[in-house]
Structure formats: structure tokens, C-alpha cells
């Protein structure tokens, strides 16, 4: 097992593990109060697309995912960091609860840190696949 020495990568891994366990308090524990969180996409094809400002708004992002899709796969396949940022590549697939359609893709997550906490998040995915799964 590899020992993580980069505190930023360890925080992102903690967030992913907390998400996987349904532990919202664990997710929020690594976020700055004024976190700037957004899932960027062309249009509004998924309920979680858009901006969430501040730690109190972030749970709505996860609720939008959890109530609309069943996650079939969520695998962090790569993490890299520099002085302020972590970039993650994630493989995920999901089935839309209302349509029964499935999408599978790689996502990119960009995490920026300030004072040891996640202050900025941008996520991108194959929005064409996501929109098709919701239609």
C-alpha cells in the first residue's frame, strides 16, 4: 500500500471515501466555508449541473446525484498535485432512475486548496452521454 504524503491528495481521497460511504459530514470536513463548487457542462442536462456557493450549498449537489441515479462504478484512476491544486481522473458509470438508461465515462475533477481546505472545485464529464441518459 502506498503512503500518501501530500495532504491535498489525502484530503481529496478522504472526500471520495466519504462520498462512497454516504458520509456528508466527512465530505464537508475538508471544504472551506466559502467553497466555490461547480459541475460545468453545456446546458442543464443533469440535476447536479451548475454552481454551488458555500459549504451549506454543496450537499444539494450530492443529493441531486443520489436521488436521480444509481452509481454502478466510481473509480479514481489517477491523482496529481502541485502547490495549490489536485487534479483527479475518475471513471464512473450510472443508471438514471427515471429512464433506466446507463452512461459510462471518465470525469476530470479540479480541486484548489487554500489554508489546507478545498476552496474551489470544478468537475467535468461527457455531458452528451449524461443528457442522453436522462432523455
Language-model regions: role of each:
Residues 3, 18, 48-49, 121:
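Short N-terminal micro-motifs specific to bacterial/archaeal maturation
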Residues 12, 16-19, 31, 39, ...:
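Hydrophobic alpha-helical core bundles mediating ligand binding, dimerization, or RNAP-core interactions
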Residues 26, 32-83:
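A solvent-exposed, acidic/Ser-Thr-rich amphipathic alpha-helical stretch
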Residues 20, 52, 98:
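Short glycine/serine/threonine-biased micro-segments
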Residues 12-15, 27-28, 35, 54, ...:
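Hydrophobic pocket/interface hotspot
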Residues 1-33, 134-135:
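Short, low-complexity N-terminal intrinsically disordered segments enriched in polar/charged residues
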Residues 2-6, 60-135:
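A beta-strand edge to alpha-helix "cap/lid" segment located at domain peripheries
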Amino acid at each position: 500500500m502506498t503512503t500518501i504524503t501530500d495532504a491535498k491528495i489525502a484530503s481529496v481521497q478522504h472526500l471520495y471515501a466519504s462520498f462512497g460511504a454516504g458520509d456528508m459530514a466527512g465530505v464537508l470536513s475538508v471544504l472551506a466555508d466559502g467553497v466555490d463548487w461547480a459541475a460545468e457542462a453545456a446546458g442543464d442536462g443533469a440535476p447536479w449541473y451548475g454552481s454551488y456557493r458555500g459549504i451549506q450549498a454543496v450537499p444539494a449537489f450530492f443529493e441531486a446525484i443520489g436521488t436521480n441515479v444509481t452509481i454502478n462504478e466510481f473509480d479514481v484512476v489517477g491523482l496529481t498535485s502541485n502547490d495549490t491544486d489536485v487534479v483527479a481522473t475518475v471513471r464512473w458509470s450510472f443508471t438514471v432512475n427515471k429512464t433506466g438508461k446507463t452512461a459510462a465515462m471518465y470525469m476530470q475533477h479540479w480541486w484548489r486548496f487554500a489554508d489546507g481546505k478545498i476552496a474551489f472545485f470544478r468537475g467535468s464529464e461527457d455531458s452528451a452521454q449524461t443528457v442522453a441518459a436522462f432523455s
